[in-house]
Amino acid sequence: MRLPIVAALLLAVACGPGEDDPSPSPETPPSSEAQAWLDAHNPVRRGAQPAPSTPLPALTWSTAAAAVAQAWAANCTYQHNAGRGTRGENIAANAPPGSLDLAGVVNAWASEAQYYDYSTNTCAAGQQCGHYTQIVWRDTLRVGCAQRACTSNSPFGSQFPNWEFWVCDYEPPGNYVGQKPY
């Protein structure tokens, strides 16, 4: 899958848990943006291959995870948030701003499925698949995401000083070493 962008970065491995176990967020109807994030994530879970013996539960929106993601995105520092608690995290960056939307970000993460071998629980040599496995991790039930337009700390260097930072935090986390996602 080619992304219609000048440049994109996806961190090589979607990180698993940090510290502090987040409690589930209260059930509230998601905003239209939150719903768009869910609408981008849940088809990936429904389409996981090989098909899980029982369907993966649909993700719901976590306002707590979204708040953590938003606070981290506001830093405009392209790295994982060490203070995210026990949340998994996917991050992405693109430039120039507007060259990618939230569905494109999730689709980029999901496209890593082509490099994941479920039978051996490995990624193809030289490829990454941790973003995909976090999305389809069976025990992950909630997600909260954020996006920030940034004008400093560009991971693309001086050629693209303006960039976008995308962060999704997952509750409970996935990507435990040695475990399959489902």
PLM ranges: what are they?
Residues 29-88:
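Short, well-ordered surface patches within globular domains
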